[in-house]
């Protein structure tokens, strides 16, 4: 739920501005990117990783170029997992964190595999959003999770309902 809330609630700019994601992203990231109607307006470019799962500066640059070639527009976000559930590789987030700033991209980090067992430092990574699940190393129950987004970044609501009062206001 938290991944869908963040991925579908962010403003990625005009239609056609793409999203970069690494090839080692968890299905809980890739499935919304490929299937949520709101995200279909923003083509996804998959960034290659080394065999061990590492994302290199060269791969980030190549992914950015590929996205620009395919859409004619700069992508608006980079999504990367801190630690891969497939390879166990822990990304160098300080290296990765500079790339989005240099290229005017939002940086979203999935820390579901690492939160609770490896330090998570959104500030030093310069992350715009950090998303996690509670049922892994945070030892929460299945179905729990959450996210952090930086101050000033807003999410559009995915669900609407009553306020309990002020019914005249829509």
Residue ranges and their predicted role:
Residues 1-170:
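Pyridoxal 5′-phosphate
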């Amino acid at each position: 739920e938290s991944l869908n809330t963040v991925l579908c609630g962010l403003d990625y700019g005009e239609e056609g501005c793409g999203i970069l994601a690494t090839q080692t992203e968890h299905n809980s990231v890739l499935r919304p990117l490929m299937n949520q109607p709101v995200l279909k307006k923003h083509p996804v470019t998959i960034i290659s990783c080394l065999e061990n799962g590492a994302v290199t500066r060269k791969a980030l640059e190549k992914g950015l170029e590929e996205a620009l070639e395919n859409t004619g527009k700069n992508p608006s976000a980079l999504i990367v997992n801190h630690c891969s559930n497939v390879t166990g590789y822990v990304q160098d987030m300080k290296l990765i964190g500079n790339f989005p700033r240099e290229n005017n991209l939002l940086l979203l980090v999935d820390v579901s595999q690492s939160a609770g067992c490896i330090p998570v430092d959104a500030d030093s990574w310069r992350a715009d959003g950090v998303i996690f699940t509670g049922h892994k190393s945070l030892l929460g129950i299945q179905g729990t999770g959450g996210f952090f987004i930086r101050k000033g970044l807003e999410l559009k609501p995915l669900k609407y309902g009553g306020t309990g009062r002020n019914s005249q206001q829509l």
